């Protein structure tokens, strides 16, 4: 019975992570709230890495054609300087540049963030900040395509992603808001945001391999972890496909409304 409870608990959290990871409402913030409301305590550091890896796998699957094209054209430009591959080569460079701020800040301030910025009230405040950003860009229609991006764009979007280390600040929301304020088209902002998710997640996973291997709960929670991984992967895939349709229709304001409601309720009642 206890094993069933653990499986059910991790199934719920896996579905929750998968649903909230792609959409701009902060998956990390919602996991904090879910654990608080349900009285759940996650045993071990591996769980967060596990579900992030599942979400990463779903993103890789959805953007596999973009990744293949970028890799092919990036290598082509390096060796042949083919003009038609230039924009993809620099798109890769800008992704690398945009990855740096979150990587550096995450390494330097991880302990501080874990200790002081993961409280429920902080999540409520951060959700309200996310709501404001989404409201500001609700009617924006930029003109920049992949080939129009600059180093300045990459740095600013990278700094926005670093802000999302705070639970309640949505990573996808922060990067899409920054990208659209810089004049990117919605589809360009969305693609840059989720392709940027890949190196950040891979980096975090590689840096934490030893934590996973040494997790004392890995043996006892193996089945619940597997269930959570599968649930997160499936739900992330569905949620990201849905969010891509929402972005195409320009309905980001509804996520703003949601973040306001949850943020206010969190500050009042939790």
Curated annotation (Swiss-Prot):
Reactions this protein catalyses: di-trans,octa-cis-undecaprenyl diphosphate + H2O = di-trans,octa-cis-undecaprenyl phosphate + phosphate + H(+)
GO molecular function terms attached to this record: undecaprenyl-diphosphatase activity
Pfam families: BacA (PF02673)
GO CC aspect terms: plasma membrane
UniProt KW keywords: Antibiotic resistance, Cell membrane, Cell shape, Cell wall biogenesis/degradation, Hydrolase, Membrane, Peptidoglycan synthesis, Transmembrane, Transmembrane helix
Chain's role: Catalyzes the dephosphorylation of undecaprenyl diphosphate (UPP). Confers resistance to bacitracin.
Other noteworthy facts: Bacitracin is thought to be involved in the inhibition of peptidoglycan synthesis by sequestering undecaprenyl diphosphate, thereby reducing the pool of lipid carrier available.
Entry protein name: Undecaprenyl-diphosphatase 1
Organism: Bacillus cereus (strain ATCC 14579 / DSM 31 / CCUG 7414 / JCM 2152 / NBRC 15305 / NCIMB 9373 / NCTC 2599 / NRRL B-3711)
Protein's gene: uppP1
């Amino acid at each position: 019975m206890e094993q069933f409870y653990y499986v059910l608990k991790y199934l719920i959290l896996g579905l929750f992570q998968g649903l909230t990871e792609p959409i701009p409402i902060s998956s990390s913030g919602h996991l904090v709230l879910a654990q608080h409301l349900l009285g759940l305590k996650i045993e071990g550091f591996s769980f967060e890495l596990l579900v992030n890896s599942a979400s990463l796998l779903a993103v890789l699957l959805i953007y596999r054609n973009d990744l293949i094209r970028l890799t092919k054209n990036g290598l082509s430009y390096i060796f042949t300087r083919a003009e038609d591959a230039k924009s993809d080569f620099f798109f890769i460079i800008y992704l690398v540049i945009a990855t740096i701020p979150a990587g550096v800040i995450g390494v330097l301030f991880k302990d501080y963030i874990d200790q002081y910025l993961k409280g429920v009230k902080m999540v409520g405040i951060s959700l309200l900040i996310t709501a404001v950003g989404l409201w500001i860009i609700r009617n924006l229609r930029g003109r920049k395509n992949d080939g129009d991006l600059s180093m300045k764009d990459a740095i600013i979007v990278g700094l926005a992603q670093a802000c999302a280390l705070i639970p309640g600040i949505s990573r996808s929301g922060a990067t899409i808001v920054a990208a659209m304020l810089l004049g990117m088209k919605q589809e360009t902002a969305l693609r840059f945001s989720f392709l940027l998710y890949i190196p950040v997640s891979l980096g975090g996973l590689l840096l934490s391999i030893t934590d996973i291997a040494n997790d004392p709960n890995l043996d006892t929670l193996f089945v619940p972890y597997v269930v959570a991984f599968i649930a997160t992967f499936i739900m992330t895939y569905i949620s990201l496909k849905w969010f891509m349709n929402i972005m195409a229709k320009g309905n980001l304001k509804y996520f703003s409304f949601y973040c306001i409601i949850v943020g206010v309720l969190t500050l009042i009642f939790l």
